[in-house]
Structures are given as C-alpha cells and as structure tokens.
Amino acid sequence: MTKTVEERERVVVRFAGDSGDGMQLAGSRFTDATAMMGNDLATLPNFPAEIRAPAGTLAGVSAFQIHFASRDILTPGDKPNVLVAMNPAALKANLPELDRGTTLILNEDAFNKRNLEKAGYAANPLEDGSLSAYRVHRIPMTSLTVRAVEGIEGASTRDAGRAKNLFALGVLSWLYGRPTDGTKKWIEKKFAGKPAVLLANLAAFNAGWSFGETTELLDVQYRVKPATDVPPGTYRNVNGTTALSLGLIAASVRSGLGLLLASYPITPASELLHELSRHASLGVKTIQAEDEIAAAGMALGAAFGGRLGVTATSGPGMDLKAETIGLAAALELPMIVVDVQRAGPSTGMPTKTEQSDLLMAVHGRHGESPLPVIAPSTPGGCFAAAFEAAQIAIRYRTPVILLSDSFLASSSEPWRVPVVGDLPSIDPAFAVAHDGEEFMPYARDELLARPWAIPGTPGLAHRIGGLEKADGTGNISYDGANHERMTELRAAKVDGIARDIPPLHVDAEPGARLLVLGWGSSEGTIRAGVRRAREAGHTVACAHLHHLNPFPVNTGQLAQLLRAKFLVDVESFCKVQGQPLFASEIEQQIAERQ
C-alpha cells in the first residue's frame, strides 16, 4: 500500500517497558542508527536501581528517551512525541508527562487482567476511552513476534517472547526511516554464539519493519533530514562514560604516563571501570579494589610511582575517599578523582541523577585542603574535561576532582573524534638529581608546584606521609609558622590554576538584567530554556561554569558559593527529583523574574 511521507524537524521518542524487556538495548540501537543518519541527537536512559524489579509494576519500568533533529539540539527533550509502551505499567508510569495528541504505540498483548491489576488499572485503558486524547496504535507485538519466530530450530517460546523489543525496534525503524543494515549486523555480532537466538531476533526485527510497511494502522512514515550545521570531521555516538575514558587514555598517551584506574564497584561509576578495562592493549591498568578507601590509596600509590593515577566513585564513595584525597593534597601528587554524582544522601536513588556533591568536592576535607574541581556539561565534553583534569593534575602536582553525574554518564550525543596527535602534549617533568645538590622535595617552581620524584631514582630519596612538611626540605614539621606558610602555598597554587582557565563566555543580549548561570549537565537545558524565553520576547543572558574551583571568575550549593565569594544576589532554582532539569522549567523561571 502507498503511504504518506511527512517531514519533521525534530522528534522525541521514548521506549518504555519492564526492566527485563530490553528497552535500553532497543533505545541504544535506535540511537546508533539515528547517528548513522546524520541527525543531531541527545538521549536519556532511565531505569530502576534493582537488577530486576518486579515485572509488570510501576517500580519496574525502564525507559530510554531519544531526541533527534535536523538541526542543533541541546537536550533529550522535556517529554516524548511518541511513547512505545510494552505493558500497562509502562503506559501508566509515563502517561502523566504526555501532552494531548502524543502518539502511543502499545503492545496490545500485554494488556491482560493480570498485568492491568499489577499496574493498578481498574479497567483496561485500551477499551474505556481514557486514551481518547492520544493517537493510539494497538499492536499485538508479543504474538506477532512469536509468529515470526515459529519454525526457527532451537528457538524456544521464551526466546520468541524476549525478542519483542526487536519487533518494536523494527516498527520504529520503519516509522522514521532508520537504516536497517547496521542493526542486522549488530544482531549477528551480538548473538553470534547463539544461532537460534540470533535468527529469532533477526526475524523479530524484520517482522517489525514489515509490519510497519504493510499495516493500515500506520499510514504515515516520517522523515527527519540529517543535520546540516555540523562541522566537518569524523563522528561517533558517545556517552559520557566512554568519552571520559577516552579522554583519560588520550592524556596518558600525550603525557607518556601509564594509566591506572582503581575503583570499587558503585552505581553509576562502575561503567568507567568496565570501559577502561577494555583498553588493556593501550597500556591501561584497571583494578577492582576491595573497598573505596583501598581504591583511592591505589590511585595515589600509582601517582607516587609515576603513573596517571585515577579513582572513580559516586557520592557515598566520596565520603570514604575523603581522607585519602586529603593525603594526596598534602603530598601534592597528581591524581584524578571522578565523582559520577547520583541522588542522595546515603544510598539514595542509585540510578537517578543529581548535582548535589558540589560543596563536598570543594570543601569536603578536614583542614585547609583546596583542590581544583572541574565539571563537564555534555557527554562529549567529558573527553575534554578528563584531558584537562590530567593536564592540571600533572602541571600543578595536585589531585583534581571531576564532577560528572548519572545523566551525563549514560546519555549520548554525536561527538567529533579528535586527532590525538593534535592534542597538546603534557610534560610530566619528572625530577632529576643534580650532582652535589641536596634534593629539595618541596621546593617550588613558578607555578608553586613541587618536584615529582619517581621512587628508586638515585639521589631523589625523600620522606612522604600525612604529617606536615617543612617548606623546601619536606622534613616533618610541627612549627606553626611553617604550617601557615605551607597552607598558604598550597592554596595559592590552586588559586593560580585560574591563569590557565579561559574567560567565562557569557551569551548576552543588550539590556539583559537577568543572567541564568549553571554548572555541569544543566547547560543544554539552560541554553534551550533561554532560547525559548528569547523567542517569547524576554531579554536574558546565560553563562555556564565548567571550573568550580578556582572560578574563572545546585541545588542551592552553587548559589552559596557565589554569594560567599562575590556578595551578589543569587536566586537559586533547584530540582531534586532524580531527573534532569527541563527547558520548559527554565523558561518558566525566566518569565517569572522578568
């Protein structure tokens, strides 16, 4: 049958189902196909903390949202235009967010009495008229998948049922004209060791595509043209974890230092350990430590031994690492601490995002121990942030804290791959012995950085430890005047990093008296909200901080720091729901202050 093709500038699609329905997989694969089409995109995975939450319940709903467009986009979208719901719970959990007219693609087979009761429905929403405000497409995905898999030798009924996410992916791939060859090759590679499962998933995907092509339910196919305002280069789809890993590896290559990551598993930082462990061929060493304190100690030991020492964690782990980070500040050794923030306090909501560790990163150590703090704002920007963290750590002989978050770590975007040889070199400038001269381990260069002496180097033996050091010699000292001088030197060294920080860019309009200022992963949302506010006639400026200590100068933490340092009036807008900010929320806050 002949179908109408309509063009769209942008679309937001959300896949939702049980945590065992493969929604993250389907969404990720749709994202890769979209990247190959040349669209700009941003994604937002959202899943429960449990490995397998109770099937069919609201608590067990897993979702993956992708916003793709023919122009530059800044966020994963506030709410979807299309919801793919694999069961009643997925529909009910997401329905409150949807606008009237949203397209619903529903797995009709799952709307049985048992699943409806689990989701808290007294009546079937497919039959009671409650969805009349939406464009509803009822598709028996499970039964059509089972039928497509029939006859495949070795494929069980369970294999057929589990492949329904690939059926849904096939339908959406047809609906938006996504290429299929890449997905088919991906299926063949992923299930190469299980021939029956491979054939079942291929059959399900092909059946979904064919259903879209032939059914009268879907009479329109949509086309989103490739983005045209993209600088030339080689691009890949990348999430924040992968970009951060590649940034650390690039810093290792450009400095000539071996990279060691020591971490204790903790959501959502564990993915960094998993990703870097895949790159042993590049000289990367990874250690899964027995606890957070041991992991920090291993990273610091690696730095003492002349490597690029890195440890990664999330909020609760930062509490445990604090003493070792303070030791690193006293030893003045280059070390990188990655904090992938999550909703807290305590265990909190491990898979939900939050920017709530700012004050801990800046001030969360006993004594006077200031450290540089960097926060990337986009998944691709995690590469540059990791590389810069290594530059600062090595150049200034200091631990550096890099604040990512769960949203940044798991969301993705097209990223232009840099040429490693074009990146600046990083000189470790290891200390060397000079005949007839006493080695002074706490002498200072023009940056106030001390020498980095590799253990075992003749003539460079020196004392380390947490006790205060005498200026220059590094001997243990309890002298009050010396302690004051060393405290001032360490602080001045960190303050001096500001000379390497570029001026803060302010996106201003003439006459603007309102500045929207943020940090971390809120940048895209802020820029999108400001864009909308300007289109509505408001005059507003925006700026974003990537360096939180020292300033190039969220919760209310950023406001506290700004008030304390600059004595300016700051109005804080905070959201503590485990989800990123929405552009519409920023737009509303601007309108209320005009």
Explain the meaning of each model-derived region:
Residues 1-255:
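Active-site cofactor/cluster-binding pocket
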Residues 10, 147-149, 218-233, 251-258, ...:
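Gly-rich Lys/Arg/Thr-decorated short loops/hinges at beta-loop-alpha junctions or inter-strand turns
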Residues 10-99, 246, 259-260, 267-363, ...:
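Thiamine diphosphate
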Residues 19, 141-144, 150-155, 169-173, ...:
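Peripheral docking tails and interdomain loops at the edges
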Residues 135-180, 184-212, 381-394, 403-469:
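Internal gly/pro-rich beta-alpha loop/helix module
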Residues 230, 237-247, 255, 385, ...:
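Flexible, low-complexity linker and terminal segments
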